[in-house]
Every structure is written in C-alpha cells, then in structure tokens.
C-alpha cells in the first residue's frame, strides 16, 4: 500500500474515531440535561446554559480531529520524504 493510501486510510479512521467519541459524549450530555430539567424545571435556564458550554467543548474535539485529518491529507510533513523514497525505489 502506498504512502498516500495510508494517509487517506489514517485520516478516515481518525475522523471516524473522533466523531464517534464526540457523538456519544454529546448524546450523554443532552440526556443528562433533559433529566435535570425534568426533575427541576425551574433551573432549566442554568442547566441549558451549562449544557451548551459543555457541548461546545465536546464539539471542539471533533474539530481538532478534523484539523489533524486535513493536515495528514493536505499538509503532510512527510510527503517530501515519501516522494524521494519512492523515486529512489523506482530507479
């Protein structure tokens, strides 16, 4: 398998794992917030504000995973080394 194929595969797996974790985390956070509001409707404003801040922090993990995957795909620091190695192997 070539270097670039491995980069694409690594980015795909990294993004899948990153979004899976954040999706589960966001689901659990919303579940807990809804349970809290159902127990104490008077505190719904405070609970929702705290939940939104928490969801933003959880979502930042998915954004970091996306940035790392884009770096792997488009700005890979090892691209030049891999191309030189491929040229020497081809000769």
UniProtKB/Swiss-Prot annotation:
InterPro entries: ATP_synth_csu_bac/chlpt (IPR005953), ATP_synth_F0_csu (IPR000454), ATP_synth_F0_csu_DDCD_BS (IPR020537), ATPase_proteolipid_c-like_dom (IPR002379), F/V-ATP_Csub_sf (IPR035921). GO terms for molecular function: lipid binding; proton-transporting ATP synthase activity, rotational mechanism. Its main location: membrane. The chain crosses the membrane at residues 4-24, 53-73. The keyword Transmembrane helix applies. GO terms for cellular component: plasma membrane; proton-transporting ATP synthase complex; proton-transporting two-sector ATPase complex, proton-transporting domain. F(1)F(0) ATP synthase produces ATP from ADP in the presence of a proton or sodium gradient. F-type ATPases consist of two structural domains, F(1) containing the extramembraneous catalytic core and F(0) containing the membrane proton channel, linked together by a central stalk and a peripheral stalk. During catalysis, ATP synthesis in the catalytic domain of F(1) is coupled via a rotary mechanism of the central stalk subunits to proton translocation. Belongs to the ATPase C chain family. PANTHER family: ATP SYNTHASE LIPID-BINDING PROTEIN, MITOCHONDRIAL, ATPASE PROTEIN 9. This is ATP synthase subunit c 2. The lineage of its organism: Bacteria, Pseudomonadati, Thermodesulfobacteriota, Desulfuromonadia, Desulfuromonadales. The gene is atpE2.
């Amino acid at each position: 398998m070539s270097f670039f194929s491995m980069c694409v595969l690594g980015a795909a797996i990294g993004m899948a794992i990153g979004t899976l974790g954040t999706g589960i985390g966001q689901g659990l956070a919303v579940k807990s917030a809804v349970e809290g509001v159902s127990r104490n409707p008077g505190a719904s404003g405070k609970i929702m504000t705290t939940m939104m801040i928490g969801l933003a922090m959880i979502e930042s993990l998915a954004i970091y995973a996306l940035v790392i995957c884009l770096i792997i795909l488009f700005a890979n620091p090892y691209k030049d080394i891999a191309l030189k190695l491929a040229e020497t192997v081809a000769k």
